[in-house]
């Protein structure tokens, strides 16, 4: 029995055009692409020259900067063991089980929280800081130095926070479960305002100012411990603010919602600074 052919049906197809003459870079871009899947922001990072440069810088330190989902998973075990062995000092900030792979999306999130002093927006919408996201061009523009320190150092601080109980399901107090990025923000606020006494713009223009701090883990550990003590005061202030919000008529705020919208408002910033002083 013959089947009737369907009439022509209009449709659409997504086409990605890669304008890159270097074969190695082309292969990097296409290696993990699956034509059946939609292109996501975290995949488009592979198309960004800025992040390719960061990957090269971090590889010299023994870390794999994963620009594209699957990059680390599909890397040969011999390459992992030979090229990505970590750094003698920087590994002290990381959990013992860390694989020396740094997700670009996590690093971006940490940079916005630390260097740009904004913990709430990257917490509430990680995707907005990916390529073509609403906030990407506000961060990645010609005013941002292509320097691994701007991404790597905030990532190290978030990783350190995990070693002291931040981001865990059973974290106590409960706020610690949601406060990894807030810890990053608090650390860099203390570092910028009270230790280096530099503005955000000055640090962005000269990221090397951060290196002596991070290369001296023992001294920096004291600042990290101090930040943790300040966060204990912050959690008390946050609890009061949280309770006040929920006491308002027709207001129901979860801790997730709190850290997405209220955790770094002007009053809580002022309170944190007062504890430091």
What are the residue ranges of the model-derived segments?
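Short glycine-/polar-rich loops that comprise or flank the Walker A/P-loop
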Residues: 9-13
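C-terminal catalytic or substrate-handling cores of phosphate/nucleotide-
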Residues: 17-181, 185-195
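C-terminal accessory/interaction regions of large nucleic acid-associated machines
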Residues: 171, 175-176, 180-277
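A sequence-level detector for short glycine-anchored, His/Arg-bearing signature motifs
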Residues: 1-3
């Amino acid at each position: 029995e013959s089947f009737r052919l369907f009439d022509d049906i209009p449709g659409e197809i997504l086409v990605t055009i890669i304008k890159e003459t270097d074969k190695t870079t082309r292969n990097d871009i296409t290696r993990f692409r699956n034509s059946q899947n939609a292109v996501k922001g975290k995949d488009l990072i592979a198309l960004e020259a800025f992040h390719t440069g960061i990957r090269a810088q971090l590889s010299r330190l023994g870390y794999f900067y994963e620009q594209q989902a699957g990059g680390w998973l599909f890397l040969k075990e011999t390459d992992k063991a030979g090229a990505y062995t970590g750094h003698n000092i920087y590994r002290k900030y990381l959990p013992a089980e860390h694989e020396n792979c740094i997700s670009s999306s996590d690093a971006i999130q940490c940079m916005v929280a630390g260097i740009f002093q904004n913990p709430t927006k990257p917490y509430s919408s990680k995707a907005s800081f990916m390529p073509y996201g609403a906030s990407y061009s506000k961060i990645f523009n010609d005013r941002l130095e292509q320097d691994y320190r701007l991404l790597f150092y905030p990532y190290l601080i978030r990783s350190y926070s995990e070693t002291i109980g931040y981001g865990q399901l059973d974290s106590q107090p409960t706020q610690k479960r949601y406060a990894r990025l807030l810890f990053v923000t608090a650390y860099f606020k203390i570092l910028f305002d009270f230790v280096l006494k530099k503005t955000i713009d000055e640090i962005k223009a000269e990221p090397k100012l951060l290196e002596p701090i991070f290369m001296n883990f023992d001294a920096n550990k004291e600042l990290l411990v101090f930040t943790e003590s300040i966060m204990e005061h912050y959690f008390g202030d946050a609890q009061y603010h949280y309770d006040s919000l929920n006491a308002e008529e027709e207001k129901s705020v979860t801790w997730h919602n709190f850290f997405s919208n209220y955790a770094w408002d002007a009053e809580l910033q002022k309170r944190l600074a007062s504890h430091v002083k």
